[in-house]
């Protein structure tokens, strides 16, 4: 869905055009931006700049604060881990937002993900599943981040552990993630995440040092 912002002169701009000018700080555009965020959640799209602009507008206009939109912005930022989007969004929160119980829950979930305690994350996510059920692709976005961490941490991993880290998924779902990440089976119980040769590669480094660079040092040694 295309969102157009109507200017005072009667002309319309796209959200991206509006964000590139002073109009991004106009509270008259807040409702359009909030609708855009709801579409991101529904259609599994993401626009960090627009989302941060909404939080900034809340800072300037706290009487227009919408907690539901704030939840969606924070949860969508989690779907873009390992990028630091959540940290940037959190830094724009108002004191009344920080005191909100649901926002504290989301912050706790973010901390758990940052610690890579994925088993605990999925447990907490199940308890709070109504919080992000409106966000299309949320679980798979988190699994993508889990896969990233697994890929840089393990060479081989037990199949049952991998299923647990990915949220207690079924074998058929696991197969799709193995294929997506280029992993391979080793026997019945192990998954090869990365071959040793792929992890360790020699690199020859040649540095050219001019005589003038060391001349003064050599003179001191004489």
UniProtKB/Swiss-Prot annotation:
Keyword Zinc: no
Cellular compartments annotated: Cytoplasm
Gene3D superfamilies registered for this protein in UniProt: ARM repeat, domain 1, Winged helix-like DNA-binding domain superfamily/Winged helix DNA-binding domain
GO cellular component: eukaryotic 43S preinitiation complex; eukaryotic 48S preinitiation complex; eukaryotic translation initiation factor 3 complex
Keyword hit for Cytoplasm: yes
Pfam families linked: CSN8_PSD8_EIF3K
One annotated GO biological process: regulation of translational initiation
Gene Ontology molecular function terms on file: ribosome binding; RNA binding; translation initiation factor activity
Family that this chain belongs to: Belongs to the eIF-3 subunit K family.
PANTHER family: EUKARYOTIC TRANSLATION INITIATION FACTOR 3 SUBUNIT 11 (PTHR13022), EUKARYOTIC TRANSLATION INITIATION FACTOR 3 SUBUNIT K (PTHR13022:SF0)
Known partners and oligomeric status: Component of the eukaryotic translation initiation factor 3 (eIF-3) complex. The eIF-3 complex interacts with pix.
Task of the protein: Component of the eukaryotic translation initiation factor 3 (eIF-3) complex, which is involved in protein synthesis of a specialized repertoire of mRNAs and, together with other initiation factors, stimulates binding of mRNA and methionyl-tRNAi to the 40S ribosome. The eIF-3 complex specifically targets and initiates translation of a subset of mRNAs involved in cell proliferation.
Record protein name field: Eukaryotic translation initiation factor 3 subunit K
Native source organism of the sequence: Drosophila persimilis (Fruit fly)
């Amino acid at each position: 869905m295309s969102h157009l912002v109507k200017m005072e002169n009667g002309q319309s701009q796209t959200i991206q055009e509006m964000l590139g000018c002073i109009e991004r700080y106009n509270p008259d555009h807040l409702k359009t931006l909030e609708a855009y965020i709801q579409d991101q959640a529904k259609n599994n799209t993401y626009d960090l700049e627009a989302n941060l602009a909404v939080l900034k507008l809340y800072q300037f206009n706290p009487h227009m604060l919408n907690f539901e939109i704030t939840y969606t912005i924070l949860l969508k930022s989690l779907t873009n881990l390992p990028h630091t989007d959540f940290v940037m969004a959190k830094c724009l929160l108002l004191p009344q937002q920080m005191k909100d119980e649901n926002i504290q829950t989301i912050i706790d979930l973010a901390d758990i993900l940052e610690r890579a305690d994925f088993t605990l994350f999925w447990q907490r996510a199940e308890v709070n599943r109504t919080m992000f059920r409106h966000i299309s692709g949320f679980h798979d976005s988190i699994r993508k981040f889990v896969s990233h961490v697994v890929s840089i941490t393990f060479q081989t991993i037990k199949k049952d552990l991998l299923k647990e880290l990915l949220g207690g998924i079924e074998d058929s779902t696991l197969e799709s993630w193995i294929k997506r990440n280029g992993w391979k089976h080793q026997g019945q119980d192990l998954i090869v995440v990365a071959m040793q040769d792929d992890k360790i590669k020699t690199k020859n480094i040649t540095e050219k040092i001019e005589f003038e660079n060391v001349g003064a040092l050599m003179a001191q040694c004489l």
